[in-house]
Amino acid sequence: MLRETWLCVILVAFVSHPVWLQKPHKRKTQLKAAGCCEEMRELKAQVANLSSLLGELSRKQESDWVSVVMQVMELESSSKHMESRLSTAESKYSEMNNQIDIMQLQAAQTVTQTSADAIYDCSSLYQKNYRISGVYKLPPDEFLGSPELEVFCDMETSGGGWTIIQRRKSGLVSFYQDWRQYKQGFGSIRGDFWLGNEHIHRLTRQPSRLRVELEDWEGNARYAEYSYFALGNELNSYRLFLGNYSGNVGKDALLYHNNTVFSTKDKDNDNCLDKCAQLRKGGYWYNCCTDSNLNGVYYRLGEHRKHMDGISWYGWHGANYSLKRVEMKIRPEAFKP
């Protein structure tokens, strides 16, 4: 009886759980694993290809960069070589022009000594008994290459014979002009004017003196004189040359500008990173920048103490005081009243 009972239990369990009817899963799992491995191999191959491409691009970029750097270095070397050659050529050219100036000056002095009837400036007119201050016309001089020139002569101050090259008294003429205007001159000969750098250069080929007359807004007058005054030619940017100072205006405010070249708003020749002509609103022999600014802005009474770009002479009233009146005049060193 017991045996028959165990057989019945085993039979029921076998029928309830027909393991023999279930399908195996092992093959499906193996297929999935094989597919994943294939995808991984493809991804690794793509990553390897990308890494190789990036490496090649990086090497090419580095090679191109080295090539560019080498080209830049070659260009810089070539540029420095050209600058050196240009500087040497300019130096030789400047030396030649200085020699020409000296020869022309010597020739001019010879002509002055041998041509008693020649009229070169206001001192020549004075020697011919023209003793009234005012406007005169100097005849053209073919030897010196100078055209007819209208000038204002001071026949009274300190013995007379002065040719006025600059005047500031009314403020009606702007002195914030370009290179061309300062070269040829501008303004009204009876009012405010600049005679012109080219004319001043020609007039000072013979040894000359400079007199600067100043007047402030309180009615005080001062002057400064220089035993020698000359301008170089345009190729030398109208370089300023001054001799010894004398006068009653205090500190010599032109000394700082001696041996400097002329600058204008469109031609920056100063010795400064700043563009002094634009800062000081004039054309002048700016150094870095100035101890005087006789071609600055004309400020009237009430405004004359507020600006640093006015008509100034630092040795008298300082940098912020704009003067009421200025005259610059020249005559030959050899002049005798």
From Swiss-Prot:
Keywords: Coiled coil, Disulfide bond, Glycoprotein, Secreted, Signal. GO terms for biological process: blood coagulation; negative regulation of vasculature development involved in avascular cornea development in camera-type eye; regulation of extracellular matrix organization. CDD domains: FReD. It is found in: Secreted. Glycans are attached at N49, N244, N258, N320. Its main location: secreted. PROSITE patterns: FIBRINOGEN_C_2 (PS51406). SMART domains: FBG. One of its GO terms (cellular component) is extracellular region. Gene3D superfamilies: Gamma Fibrinogen, chain A, domain 1 (3.90.215.10). Residues 1-21 form the signal peptide. Residues 113-334 form the Fibrinogen C-terminal domain. GO terms for molecular function: identical protein binding. SUPFAM superfamilies: Fibrinogen C-terminal domain-like (SSF56496). InterPro entries: FIB_ANG-like, Fibrinogen-like_C, Fibrinogen_a/b/g_C_1, Fibrinogen_a/b/g_C_dom. Residues 30-110 form a coiled coil. Disulfide bonds join C122-C153, C276-C289. Homotetramer; disulfide-linked. Has a role in the formation and organization of the extracellular matrix. In the eye, it functions as a mediator of dexamethasone-induced matrix deposition in the trabecular meshwork, the tissue responsible for the outflow of the ocular aqueous humor and for the maintenance of intraocular pressure. Is a negative regulator of angiogenesis in the cornea, and plays a major role in maintaining corneal avascularity and transparency. This is Angiopoietin-related protein 7. It comes from Mus musculus (Mouse).
